[in-house]
Regions:
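Motif-centric detector for short Cys/His coordination patterns
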Residues: 1-29, 47-53, 67, 71-73
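Flexible C-terminal active-site loop/helix
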Residues: 2-14, 24-27, 37, 294-377
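Metal-dependent enolase-superfamily TIM-barrel catalytic cores that perform enediolate-based chemistry
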Residues: 120-236
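Conserved, mostly hydrophobic/aromatic
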Residues: 4, 39, 64, 102, ...
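Hydrophobic faces of well-ordered beta-strands that scaffold small-molecule active sites
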Residues: 44, 131-134, 160-162, 187-193, ...
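Shared catalytic-loop signature of beta/alpha-barrel
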Residues: 207, 213, 224-342, 346
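Metal- or metallocofactor-binding catalytic centers and their adjacent structured scaffolds
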Residues: 6, 35-113
């Protein structure tokens, strides 16, 4: 049996070109490097934009790394056992985000050892997937927001997503009306409240905004409010989208069974990696829900190319100037390209996501085990 020989990690922050808020000017990355007993190597990562990256790093270093040594290195085989081992620290959140660092690296190693990509290992079903323009823009002036939307139109996106949740509903109405006028009637418009409303405010807001032909309302309520989302779904006609802040397969099952979400958006890192993501894909199909992976297009886009065909077109979110490639964070060329509104995959092995170190003290990428390939034979 091929087993895990070692897991090493590195914590770093990647500066954002467009800050998401005054206090969100960078995102936390924990780069991971796994070596298997047969010498094969894989690279992965965990990710937490604002809060908790050092905690994720500590869990990887002090608990996951030693507990993974000697376990099966076949992707998916050690995930459940490690999750049960870590469960005392919580079933989801920091634990699943940290588990993704190992899970992604194991999938990367599996594909690299076969000289191919992860999408090929999983079974690519399409050559391209449609993207949509997205941004953290509630703090933008109306003029800045419309300029951003125009950039998305010029980039060929057939759908865009903007933030809502201003203190005054009238301002949300003005902003959404202006964006719809700029988009015209044929492009899709999604809105995201980022958990800013309670049930009654969400009901009133969606009723008022629905005149603008919305594709979905995202995270209208506190993310873990199952009963609230189920009730809101009964009150409104606009599909509810959520999932970026659900951390386990079990929680996705709860929301789907309750009819609390018509669109699910698992973040592949937050749910624990590719292994649990694949189960969430199955759950969404069982319940007839659309599934669009959340953020991280270099990763989400590759997985989107492998998703089974359903009644819903798969979409990939492209937050303006926030992809790892656009931020200059990758040691290698980006594994995906987004152009004319579509995401396609570039030739690469594994996931093709290795992070360039923040160089200090004269170090070079060749000195770093997380970016330099080694011969372990």
């Amino acid at each position: 049996m091929t087993t895990v020989r070692s897991l090493t990690t590195r914590l770093q922050r990647v500066p954002l070109t467009r800050p998401w808020a005054a206090d969100v000017t960078s995102v936390g990355i924990i780069a991971t490097h796994v070596v298997r007993s047969d010498g094969a190597e894989g690279w992965g990562f965990s990710w937490s934009p604002q809060i908790g990256a050092p905690a994720v790093h500590a869990l990887l270093e002090h608990d996951i790394a030693p507990a993974s040594v000697g376990r099966s290195a076949v992707p998916g085989e050690c995930w459940q056992g490690l999750w049960e081992h870590l469960h005392e620290a919580g079933g989801g959140g920091v634990t699943t985000i940290a588990l993704a660092g190992l899970d992604l690296a194991l999938w990367d190693a599996e594909a690299r050892s076969a000289g191919t990509s992860v999408s090929h290992v999983l079974g690519r079903r399409r050559e391209r997937v449609r993207g949509y323009g997205s941004g953290v823009n509630l703090h933008y002036s109306l003029e800045e927001l419309l300029a951003q939307v125009q950039r998305w139109i010029d980039a060929g996106f057939e759908g865009v997503k903007i933030k809502v949740g201003k203190p005054d509903l009238a301002e949300d109405l003005d902003r959404v009306a202006a964006v719809r006028a700029l988009l015209g009637p044929d492009r899709a418009l999604m809105i995201d409240a980022n958990q800013r409303w309670d049930l009654d405010r969400a009901t009133a807001s969606v009723d008022a905004l629905s005149r603008f032909s919305l594709a979905w309302i995202e995270e209208p309520l506190r993310a873990d409010d199952l009963a609230g989302h189920a009730e809101l779904a009964r009150r409104i006609d606009v599909p509810i989208a959520l999932g970026e802040n659900l951390h386990t397969v079990h929680r996705f099952g709860d929301f789907l069974r309750a009819g609390a979400a018509q669109v699910v958006q698992p973040n592949i890192v937050r749910v624990g990696g590719i292994t649990p993501f694949l189960r969430i894909v199955e759950l969404a199909a069982e319940h007839g829900a659309a599934l669009h992976p959340h953020l991280l297009p270099e990763l989400s886009g590759q997985l989107a190319l492998t998703l089974p065909d359903t009644a819903h077109e798969v979409l990939v979110e492209d937050v303006e100037d926030a992809g790892f490639g656009a931020l200059g964070a990758l040691a290698d060329p980006s594994p995906v390209t987004i152009g004319d509104g579509w995401l396609t995959e570039n030739a690469h092995e594994g996931l093709g996501i290795r992070f360039a170190p923040l160089l200090t003290g004269g170090r070079t990428p060749a000195d770093d085990p997380l970016t330099a390939r080694k011969d372990h034979s």
